[in-house]
Amino acid sequence: MDAAKIHAKIYAGRGKAALRLGLLYDVMRPVTASDPFSNKVTTLNAAFNNTDNKYLKANHPGEPLWYGDFDGRQTLAGDYLAGADSTYFIAAQQQLLPIICVECNRTVRMTRPVVPVPESESDNVSVLPYSGMCQSADESVDVLGSSPQGGLPAVGWPASVLFGKGKLRNATALKAGTPEQLGWQIMLPVSVPLVFQPGDVLVDDLGNQFSVSGAELSDTGWRLQAIEVHI
């Protein structure tokens, strides 16, 4: 028996375990930047444990990673699992190993300026407000999710938005006298169809705004270091 068949049998076994332990989740596979839940693939049973495989450890605050027990033959890294009370995205489906999932506690959307400020003018405080962010819909365009319009609510991508480690300085704020702030870590799936850049601003479903200080893409998805900003 080759490795691929063993891998498939492991996923089949996890699927059988989920039939006893798990709840129903819709598998959503993003195909557009504007709405990650427009493409439902299937519904399956899934159970999640705090990376111990024995279901003995409780999850603690600030820990978004879980192991998922479900039939991985029906899913891909980057898929969302949307349940009645919780949403996860699949961070990685590595050969013969547990399926790594990230619990989502917020949804986020992002706009970018229609006309970027020339680098030669980036130090001119009269060009944009201090934060460098757009103040109106006419100055920006949706690139991830969608802004509220026409009486319709905003649409965001489910993400993990938790306190990070250490303090950060807003890369788009005025350079002189800018205080450091407590950082945030935002995690999004590899299925996000864009590349994050320092200075990007994300807005969550509570209206909080986060300026990206650094972005890392790996086989487990996006990790963004960000600070909360106020304009």
Model regions and ranges:
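Short, intrinsically disordered N-terminal pre-domain segments
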Residues: 1-20, 230-231
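Short Lys/Arg-enriched alpha/beta "domain-start" segment
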Residues: 15-24, 30-36
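Short, conserved turn/kink motifs that form compact alpha/beta structural patches or helix kinks used as
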Residues: 30-231
